[in-house]
Swiss-Prot record:
Annotated protein name in UniProt: Alpha-1,4-glucan:maltose-1-phosphate maltosyltransferase
GO biological process assignments: alpha-glucan biosynthetic process
Gene: glgE
Ranges for region Disordered: 1-43
Active site location: 473 (nucleophile), 502 (proton donor)
């Protein structure tokens, strides 16, 4: 149903004009000797009923639920999403469409309606939308709403102050109300059809329409009120047939007024449901990762040795990320790397003289987490990198791995921050049978307040340098309360800062991390490759979990190279990119993906010659021969052009007839797109990187808000080709031609 606009309306009395018209018509009737019919207005019908001692049914009174658990005149309950444990509000990005549902009902056969009202942090109503009953048997009502308007403005850009004012705690209230018109219409149609107590039924309808016209908070225009008054007069006219009288109140014009400006009796608002509305890029984001030491790295022609890149040469990586349409550049730790127990190539225990070590073995005599590795440059170089990123419209996300090499300054300054063995030595990190001899884990039981204070100091330092996002390495191996305190302290001073959790762990821990402030998270998408796996996983990511845990889809990372990506070549890389970009509002690419770097280290699901342990020299001119960079660019362009890609709450899996063809749709109604036009994307992917497949794709047009009376004109956003679609549609996709369709409904 269309949005219901409610505003107080000062009505100019039309009594004199109405009376004049009635008298004129009565006079005209008296002039005709053949007829002595009497025409009555709705007011006359009501007065006549009162003189006969009849009770016209009173409208339901409005009763508010002033306390939690209290019911109003209309029952409203089981609202979703609800505040988790009554403490943690659901989280959405500014302008992100999301679904509200509730059970709304009343005693007996009376029909009800429901409306969702959105209010900003200052209590101002910003949206009011009628809900739709999707399951009458369970009294379940639903509607899509949004908090504020979507924006692409970055924290440093002009105009961001206006965005910032919209962030914070919003509320959505569900109002249940008695739908007197629909209740009357249901019974009146039956009574007229069987000619049972027709006059009472139609006079009741005339009274109802007249009351509807007089009600001040319906948002009716003067013209609308005239329409209802005239309909009431016609319905009360006993000179007309019962069918004609009923038609006065049962027609498309009255139905349209009911859709947009209904008569709402017994309005019963629920308790407001809180939502935490976060800044742009908290949900809808495109990430790009590269290692600064590999950007601009070259091979010395005289010695054959690698000359590593620096923060200055990393400007090329920024240019590439921006050209491909990404929003965020994610850098691994840029801090000094320890020497003691430094790892060699492919995570070997002994490093060679030219091995740079892992940037996750943090800290040396040159400094710790608050220092730039001199091999990369200086803090001024880092600030210049951030400044250039901002000029390109990119945010900088810095990896913050809270662990230390044996050479970290903390080891001497704060030995109590580390676990000690009985022999007095510090225990290195272990996850049996894996051992990380170059890393000392932190012991949070010794001095958590002291560690929190130091981490807050360091994060503030990098924020001042230009960082707007922290990607936290393995946050699930640290206390949740620690992160709760740190994130609260950092965002109190810098509310624009976002946190991503690199946490592959149990659902409970991932949910807890989202509660305490991690706006996005890595997830198990890389291992969801079959049709069955994806049909199960996509609705989970884009369902109720999406109100708290914003999964970011990465096809690969420095630590993850699955068999699917290894075995399916260019087509497989394109398939996984399409699934990542269209399957989640947040997705990311680790550089080298454009060059089909898909050789696994034997026995491990990671790349051989892992960039974590060495500098990689890449020839980016070869990227053109694969076409993957063009695919990444196209995907980001499509995402930015289509509001349907913005939300974690609008994905529907579509039935297909082939086990290798996956299809899903994203739909955002016109009222929520910001363009005034509905936006629907239909994504169809061939999961087989070696063979062509054909399939029928079924669309439930009405459920997707699409027209059912004519063919749909759809455009493939990847190729520009156009097709006509309907309920059932044939597709053929091949890895050497089109691996996917991304169809936009025109």
């Amino acid at each position: 149903m269309a949005a219901v606009q409610h505003r107080a309306t000062t009505r100019t009395s039309n009594t004199d004009n109405s009376t004049t018209k009635t008298k004129s018509k009565a006079t005209s009737a008296r002039k005709s000797p053949a007829t002595k019919r009497k025409r009555v207005s709705a007011e006359t019908a009501r007065a006549a009923a009162a003189l006969k001692g009849l009770a016209v049914e009173a409208p339901a009174p409005s009763i508010e639920a002033n306390e939690p658990g209290q019911f109003g005149r209309i029952n409203v309950m089981d609202i979703t999403p609800a505040e988790e444990r009554g403490i943690f509000p659901a989280r959405v990005e500014l302008g992100e469409p999301f679904e509200m549902t509730a059970q709304v009902f009343i005693e007996g056969r009376t029909k009800v309606g429901a409306t969702a009202i959105v209010r900003n942090p200052r209590g101002k109503e910003t949206m009011r939308r009628a809900m739709t009953c999707v399951n009458p048997g369970l009294d379940r009502w639903t509607v899509m709403v949004k908090c504020g308007e979507h924006s692409d403005l970055k924290p440093w850009e002009d105009g961001y102050a206006a965005v910032k004012r919209q962030l914070g705690e919003w509320t959505v209230t569900i109002e249940g109300w008695e739908d007197a018109y629909v209740s009357w219409l249901h019974d009146a149609r039956i009574k007229v059809r069987v000619m049972d107590d027709v006059d009472n039924a139609l006079n009741s309808g005339a009274e109802l329409l007249a009351r509807w016209a007089e009600t001040p908070d319906t948002g009716l225009t003067a013209r609308d009120r005239k329409t209802l008054e005239k309909a009431a007069e016609t319905m009360a006219d006993q000179t007309l047939s019962a069918e004609d009288r009923l038609a006065a109140g049962d027609n498309p014009t009255i139905a349209a007024l009911h859709e947009t400006h209904p008569l709402r009796d017994g309005i019963s608002p629920s308790q407001p449901q809180r939502f935490k509305v976060e800044r742009p890029k908290s949900s809808f984001a495109a990430w790009y990762q590269f290692f600064p030491r590999s950007e601009g790295a070259t091979i010395d022609p005289n010695t054959g040795k690698i000359i590593q890149g620096t923060l200055k040469t990393s400007m090329a990586g920024l240019e590439r990320a921006a050209a491909e349409g990404f929003d965020i550049v994610y850098l691994p730790p840029v801090f000094p790397i320890g020497v003691t127990n430094r790892k060699g190539r492919n995570n070997t225990l002994v490093a060679g003289p030219d091995d740079p070590g892992s940037p996750f073995g943090i800290g040396s005599e040159l400094g710790g987490h608050d220092t730039v590795d001199p091999l990369l440059g200086t803090m001024d170089d880092f600030k210049a990198l951030c400044q250039r990123a901002h000029e390109l419209g990119l945010e900088i996300a810095l990896d913050f791995a809270l662990q230390c090499s044996p050479d970290h300054p903390w080891v001497k300054a704060h030995p109590n921050w580390f676990r000690h063995k009985p022999d007095g030595s510090i225990a290195f990190a272990e996850n049996p049978p894996k051992k990380y001899q170059d890393i000392y884990p932190i012991d949070f039981n010794a001095d958590m307040p002291g560690i929190e204070k130091e981490v807050e100091r360091i994060m503030n330092l990098w924020i001042e340098a230009g960082v707007t996002i922290f990607r936290i390495d393995n946050p699930h191996t640290k206390p949740v309360r620690f992160w709760q305190d740190v994130i609260a302290a950092v965002t109190k001073k810098h509310p624009e800062i976002l946190f991503l959790a690199e946490a592959f762990t149990r659902p409970g821990m991932m949910r807890a991390l989202s509660y305490v402030g991690f706006t996005q998270s890595h997830c198990y998408f890389p291992w969801r490759n079959t049709k069955d796996e994806l049909e199960e996983y996509l609705p989970v990511t884009n369902g109720d979990d999406g109100y708290y845990q914003h999964n970011t889809f990465w096809p690969t990372t420095p630590d993850i190279l699955t068999a699917y990506v290894r075995d399916n070549g260019v087509a497989g890389h394109c398939v996984r990119a399409v699934l990542a970009a269209m399957g989640s509002p947040s997705w990311g690419i680790y550089n080298g993906y454009e060059l089909i770097e898909n050789k696994q280290r034997p026995g491990f699901e990671e790349q051989i010659d892992n960039e974590k342990y060495e500098v990689k020299v890449r020839d980016w001119s070869k990227a053109k021969q694969y076409g993957v960079a063009e695919m990444l660019t196209a995907l980001n362009k499509i995402r930015r052009a289509h509001p349907a890609a913005l939300s974690y709450h609008n994905l529907t899996v579509l039935p297909t007839s082939d086990p290798n063809i996956l299809a899903f749709a994203r739909h955002t109604p016109a009222e929520l797109t910001g363009t005034g036009q509905a936006d629907t994307l239909i994504v169809v992917v061939n999961l087989d990187g070696h063979n062509a497949h054909q399939s029928m794709i079924h669309l439930e047009l009405s459920e997707l808000g699409l027209p059912t009376d004519r063919p749909l004109n759809v455009r493939d956003e990847l190729t520009g080709r156009e097709f006509q679609w309907g309920w059932d549609n044939y597709v053929s996709l091949a890895p050497w031609a089109d691996v996917a369709h991304i169809l936009s409904v025109q």
